[in-house]
């Protein structure tokens, strides 16, 4: 099953079963570790391997994987600094790691025999709650008790109206991040399953380009929204 959907043999699932990670818990009769966690770990290991290969022989004139990672990482850093300012360098490592994990998690779901950790609502909720905690942490760290001014509006007489609106708005952010990514990736899985059922494997190849593009866009949207939330917490409240 791929996120609850029929799927070809999942290679990482089979490997996990062989080492006992999918043994049933005697009390709750559930898997010791859920499959979406296994695939999240797989995405992390893949990124670590690629990062190690890219930095194993650093050169002044980059090529291959080093060149690819320098373009991606450097481009993301420039984007963050342009939008947040120099303060963005403090939060950039978090944003970059978030983007790389999401795009890797999205894309591995397109590989036959693998599944995407981001088509599970729990994975996305964990990332969304981490973003929520992280930008509020930076807001409190930067402004202390004055961070509450971000929720009060520009005039004191608007506080009774703005405070509840802002609180609801901020609480809705993790839900929005979770459902946006989950809905898009799960929808992609459903379409892939239907295409495999209705058309030969070769007939699905053109869709892979479209889905790859959509996966990259969804990763960037999540990254950009997290950056906007961080920018709001780092900027001075007016």
UniProtKB/Swiss-Prot annotation:
Against PROSITE patterns, the record matches this protein to: ATPASE_A
Pfam families for the chain? ATP-synt_A (PF00119)
Query: Which keywords does UniProt give here?
Result: ATP synthesis, Cell inner membrane, Cell membrane, CF(0), Hydrogen ion transport, Ion transport, Membrane, Transmembrane, Transmembrane helix, Transport
For membrane topology, the record states:
Multi-pass membrane protein
Q: Does the keyword Membrane apply?
A: yes
Q: Name one GO cellular component term.
A: proton-transporting ATP synthase complex
Q: Which residues form a coiled coil?
A: none
Cited InterPro entries:
ATP_syn_F0_a_bact/chloroplast (IPR045082), ATP_synth_F0_asu (IPR000568), ATP_synth_F0_asu_AS (IPR023011), F0_ATP_A_sf (IPR035908)
* UniProt subcellular location: Cell inner membrane
Membrane-crossing residue ranges in chain numbering: 35-55, 61-81, 94-114, 128-148, 151-171, 190-210, 211-231
Q: Which domain of life is it from?
A: Bacteria
Name one molecular function that GO assigns to this entry. Answer: proton-transporting ATP synthase activity, rotational mechanism
- Which GO terms fall under biological process for this protein? proton motive force-driven plasma membrane ATP synthesis
Which SUPFAM superfamilies does this entry report, sorted A to Z?
A: F1F0 ATP synthase subunit A
Q: What's the family?
A: Belongs to the ATPase A chain family.
The free-text function statement in the UniProt record for this protein reads:
Key component of the proton channel; it plays a direct role in the translocation of protons across the membrane.
Q: How the protein assembles, per its UniProt entry?
A: F-type ATPases have 2 components, CF(1) - the catalytic core - and CF(0) - the membrane proton channel. CF(1) has five subunits: alpha(3), beta(3), gamma(1), delta(1), epsilon(1). CF(0) has three main subunits: a(1), b(2) and c(9-12). The alpha and beta chains form an alternating ring which encloses part of the gamma chain. CF(1) is attached to CF(0) by a central stalk formed by the gamma and epsilon chains, while a peripheral stalk is formed by the delta and b chains.
Give the PANTHER family listed for this entry. ATP SYNTHASE SUBUNIT A, CHLOROPLASTIC
Tell me the protein's name.
ATP synthase subunit a
**UniProt organism field:** Solidesulfovibrio magneticus (strain ATCC 700980 / DSM 13731 / RS-1)
Q: Which gene encodes it?
A: atpB
């Amino acid at each position: 099953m791929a996120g609850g959907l029929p799927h070809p043999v999942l290679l990482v699932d089979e490997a996990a079963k062989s080492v006992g990670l999918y043994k049933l818990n005697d009390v709750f009769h559930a898997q010791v570790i859920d499959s979406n966690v296994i695939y999240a770990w797989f995405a992390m290991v893949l990124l670590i391997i690629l990062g190690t290969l890219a930095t194993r022989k650093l050169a002044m004139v980059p090529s291959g994987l080093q060149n690819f990672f320098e373009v991606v990482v450097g481009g993301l850093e420039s984007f963050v600094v342009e939008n947040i300012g120099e303060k963005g360098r403090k939060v950039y490592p978090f944003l970059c790691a978030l983007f790389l994990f999401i795009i890797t998690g999205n894309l591995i779901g397109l590989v036959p025999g693998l599944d995407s950790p981001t088509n599970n609502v729990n994975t996305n909720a964990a990332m969304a709650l981490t973003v929520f905690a992280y930008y509020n942490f930076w807001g409190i760290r930067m402004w202390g008790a004055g961070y509450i001014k971000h929720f009060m509006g520009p005039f004191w007489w608007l506080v009774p109206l703005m405070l509840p609106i802002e609180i609801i708005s901020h609480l809705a952010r993790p839900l929005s991040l979770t459902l946006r990514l989950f809905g898009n990736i799960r929808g992609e899985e459903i379409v892939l399953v239907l295409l495999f059922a209705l058309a030969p494997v070769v007939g699905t190849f053109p869709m892979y380009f479209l889905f790859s593009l959509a996966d990259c866009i969804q990763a960037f949207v999540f990254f950009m929204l997290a950056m906007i939330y961080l920018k709001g917490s780092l900027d001075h409240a007016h």
